[in-house]
């Protein structure tokens, strides 16, 4: 007689629910801890406001106010620094725009100058610099000074010859003489002979120092000694020595002589 033995291969028993779905045995109904929803872990050192005493709560609120005040101060400082940086950037941009505008105007003026030079036939300098470089070139200055007076550069007006008249005349004027000729005329307003005048040069030669005192006109004289008609001192009638007459022929410059006319001898 065969006996029915329950199978031991599977120890799992299936229980059907009223809806017909199989339900595992209580052995498999045990869930793992990871399957359960995790609860937020509390940080150490934190306490709930509800558990604080009134003094602790007041101190906590004071600390919070101080922290918020510091945060607001830092935020305000940061905003002011950003505003200053923005203003600096704007000013730099304005300076750059002004510089660009000046550069554009400078280029326009250079083009206008070049056009005017071309219109009036003025030679354009080799560089675009508004000033001629030859002004600051030492070699150009030395070469210009070493050149003759007849050659002139086109940058300068020609100057008339030295000694020419400054007034513009229809006929060319003669150049000035460097030395004036000495005049041989004894006196411009005299009609008498040469012996009637006392010729006294300002630079007396050494041979005339020994002349007698009678040949010289005295500085002090009375009214009777003067000629009433002309106001000249009367002649004393003393003949001049031959040495003085010989010295009279020396060439003396015209500007260094002094003439003292005398009245004719009575």
Curated annotation (Swiss-Prot):
Where, subcellularly, is it found? Answer: Nucleus
Alphabetically list the UniProt keywords: DNA-binding, Nucleus, Transcription, Transcription regulation, Virulence
Region named Basic motif:
59-81
Gene Ontology molecular function, alphabetical: DNA binding
Show the ranges annotated as biased composition (Basic and acidic residues).
61-73
- Which positions fall inside the bZIP domain? 54-95
Q: Mind telling me which GO cellular component terms the entry cites?
A: nucleus
Which tissues and organs express this gene's product? Expressed in appressoria.
Where is this protein primarily located?
nucleus
**Annotated segments matching region Disordered:** 1-73
The UniProt record lists the keyword Transcription:
yes
* Region span, Leucine-zipper: 82-89
List the biased-composition ranges (Polar residues). Answer: 7-22, 47-56
Q: Any idea what a deletion of this gene does? A: Impairs pathogenicity on barley and rice plants, as well as on detached barley leaves. Does not affect the differentiation, turgor build-up and maturation of appressoria but impairs the formation of invasive infection hyphae and completely abolishes the ability to penetrate into barley and rice epidermal cells. Has no effect on conidiation, mycelial growth nor resistance to cell wall and oxidative stress.
Which family is this protein grouped under?
Answer: Belongs to the bZIP family.
User: What's this protein's function?
Assistant: Transcription factor that is required for infection of plants hosts. Is not implicated in the development of appressoria or the subsequent penetration of host leaves, but is necessary for the initial establishment of the fungus within plant cells by orchestrating the expression of a unique set of early invasion-related genes within appressoria, encoding secreted effectors, enzymes, secondary metabolism-related enzymes, and signaling membrane receptors. Controls the expression of targeted genes by interacting directly with a 5'-TGACTC-3' motif present in their promoters.
Q: What is this protein called?
A: Transcription factor BIP1
